[in-house]
Amino acid sequence: MGQGAAENEMVVKQDLKVVAEVRRFVRLVTGQWGMDDFVPCLVASELVTNALQHAESATSATGDDVILRLSRTEDDALWMEVQDAAYGLPHMLAADTTSETGRGLFIVDQYARCWGIRALADNVGKVVFAVLDRT
């Protein structure tokens, strides 16, 4: 991972209203790094909203909170990861044209250089990550 990951971490409480705060946090960090914030804000919104909507009442080291981490890679891309305590692994859905949900990971897939999922040890949750090129 990149530089300063511990300094660029936000604990997100289980409330969809805080997604606006997530975007403010992303704007602050990307602004400090001289990066455009549109795509990072969009991807963070989708990943955090997905984590909050699908969170289970699970006990783990992080409790039920969602954690957003931002760092830079060696080639100056943005590494974004969202950690939650839910056991289920997300997957892209084939949303129809009238559906109001189900497009989050499709949006992430369109904008990220790459993205993926890794389960945490002892089945205490997962991390969904995305790498965004500097624009």
Where are the language model's segments positioned?
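Conserved ATP-binding N-box helix of the HATPase_c
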Residues: 37-61
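Conserved beta-strand-loop-beta-strand hairpin that lines the nucleotide-binding pocket
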Residues: 1-9, 52-135
